Curated annotation (Swiss-Prot):
<dbReference type="GO" id="GO:0019684">
    <property type="term" value="P:photosynthesis, light reaction"/>
</dbReference>
<comment type="subunit">
    <text>NDH-1 can be composed of about 15 different subunits; different subcomplexes with different compositions have been identified which probably have different functions.</text>
</comment>
<dbReference type="GO" id="GO:0016655">
    <property type="term" value="F:oxidoreductase activity, acting on NAD(P)H, quinone or similar compound as acceptor"/>
</dbReference>
<protein>
    <recommendedName>
        <fullName>NAD(P)H-quinone oxidoreductase subunit H</fullName>
        <ecNumber>7.1.1.-</ecNumber>
    </recommendedName>
</protein>
<keyword id="KW-0874">Quinone</keyword>
<keyword id="KW-0521">NADP</keyword>
<keyword id="KW-0813">Transport</keyword>
<keyword id="KW-1278">Translocase</keyword>
<keyword id="KW-0472">Membrane</keyword>
<keyword id="KW-0520">NAD</keyword>
<dbReference type="InterPro" id="IPR001135">
    <property type="entry name" value="NADH_Q_OxRdtase_suD"/>
</dbReference>
<keyword id="KW-0793">Thylakoid</keyword>
<dbReference type="GO" id="GO:0051287">
    <property type="term" value="F:NAD binding"/>
</dbReference>
<keyword id="KW-0618">Plastoquinone</keyword>
<dbReference type="InterPro" id="IPR022885">
    <property type="entry name" value="NDH1_su_D/H"/>
</dbReference>
<dbReference type="GO" id="GO:0048038">
    <property type="term" value="F:quinone binding"/>
</dbReference>
<comment type="similarity">
    <text>Belongs to the complex I 49 kDa subunit family.</text>
</comment>
Length: 394
């Protein structure tokens, strides 16, 4: 008796660019063989706004408000890297107090970034309840930002070459300590609700596995790299700002799957709380912007034509001239390594301003880890990468 053989034709399906689970206007052209993913082609560029060219036609103080719109979940990180590049090129020293304030803002942003990742990721895999919890905690961080900078999520415009825009208001550090005391037990609640949930673990364990060598070869960074067994964190490696003053550990796992990436981000929130508590206790006194302080001491009749006095934080001109030279500077954001390659030519605007977005690099490995996966796993794997398309497309 002959047995009938069935032959399936591959089917091409478009996910996005306006799918509710796409984490932005990302389009995936997926080739399916039944329920199995055969191929995947990401289509990006829907949010391209020419940020690098805008940077090359703006002074630094004019460009800082732009960058928080690239990655709205990591605005402080991009503000920091945009001012760090000309600072290092011009060898400008940042006061210790300003460095501590920067570290506090960056760690608050790291927690807010991971919370914004956690809620939608759990919603992608079917857990709706934590989505509402994370916004409760993020609102407290936004309240702290609003008290210090005047804005909540984006357009904080707080970082300046040589320091920060203004000092912290009276009582702000106590409020930050209260947040740390309140948020610590909330992470325990998340873990009790999520981490050992058998449905959640069976849903994502073993999904999207990335090996150690593969992560290095694809230039992954952040939780994507650390979840693959590489304990690499630029706060420890590059010793920028004042992170050497604090005691904290690098969060990393060995499995390299979606569950490992979840564990890394949960532990990073705990480590950020540890850094915040130490920074609030150890923050020194002194000026928050050395250029403003020196100008005040000199008075109106002082020599304002020198290098240190070219930058006026509250006005566009006279402004800071970026000296001749080029360098690449980087820092560890919630998504990984973000960096800026700057080339100055002794002008108020840079000759070249190249931005490296962490999620742009991390997204490149998506087609390779999707091959062989099921259709239902596409959103879980994509969600574990943590992608914001504003910074991917720039």
């Amino acid at each position: 008796m002959t047995q009938l053989e069935t032959r399936t034709e591959p089917m091409v399906v478009n996910f996005g660019p306006h799918h509710p689970s796409m984490h932005g206007v990302l389009r995936l052209v997926v080739t399916l063989d039944g329920e199995d993913v055969v191929d995947c082609e990401p289509v990006i560029g829907y949010l391209h706004r020419g940020m690098e060219k805008i940077a090359e036609n703006r002074t630094n103080v004019m460009f800082v408000p732009y960058v928080s719109r690239m990655d709205y979940a990591a605005g402080m990180f991009y503000e920091a890297i945009v001012v760090n590049a000309p600072e290092r090129l011009a060898n400008i020293k940042v006061p210790k107090r300003a460095s501590y304030i920067r570290a506090i803002m960056l760690e608050l942003n790291r927690i807010a970034n991971h919370l914004l990742w956690l809620g939608p990721f759990l919603a992608d895999v079917g857990a709706q309840t934590p989505f509402f919890y994370i916004f409760r905690e993020r609102e407290m961080i936004y309240d702290l930002w609003e008290a210090a900078t005047g804005q909540r999520l984006i357009n904080n415009n707080y970082f300046r070459i040589g320091g920060v825009a203004c000092d912290l208001p009276w009582g702000w550090l106590e409020k930050c300590k209260d947040f740390c005391d309140w948020f610590g037990p909330k992470i325990d609640e998340y873990e009790k609700l999520i981490t050992n949930n058998p449905i959640f673990r069976r849903r994502i364990e073993g999904l999207g596995v990335i090996g150690k060598e593969q992560a290095i070869n694809w230039s992954l960074s952040g939780p994507m790299l650390r979840a693959a067994g590489v304990p690499w964190d630029l706060r420890k490696v590059d010793h920028y700002e004042c992170y050497d003053d604090f005691e904290w550990d690098i969060a990393w796992e060995k499995e390299g799957d979606c569950y490992a990436r979840y564990r890394v981000r949960i532990e990073e929130m705990r480590q950020s709380l540890k850094i915040l508590r130490q920074a609030c206790e150890m923050i020194p006194g002194g000026p928050t912007e050395n250029l403003e302080a020196q100008r005040t001491v000199e008075g109106k009749k002082g020599d304002l034509s020198g290098f240190d006095y070219q930058y006026v934080a509250k006005k566009v001109a006279p402004t800071f001239k970026i000296p001749n030279g080029e360098l690449y500077t980087r820092l560890e954001s919630g998504k990984g390594e973000i960096g800026v390659f700057i080339q100055g030519n002794n002008d108020v605007t840079p000759w070249r301003f190249k931005i490296r977005a962490a999620d742009s690099n991390n997204l490149q490995i998506l087609p390779h880890i999707l091959k062989g996966a099921k259709v239902a796993d596409i959103m879980a794997i994509l969600g574990s990468i943590d992608v914001i398309m504003g910074s991917v497309d720039r």
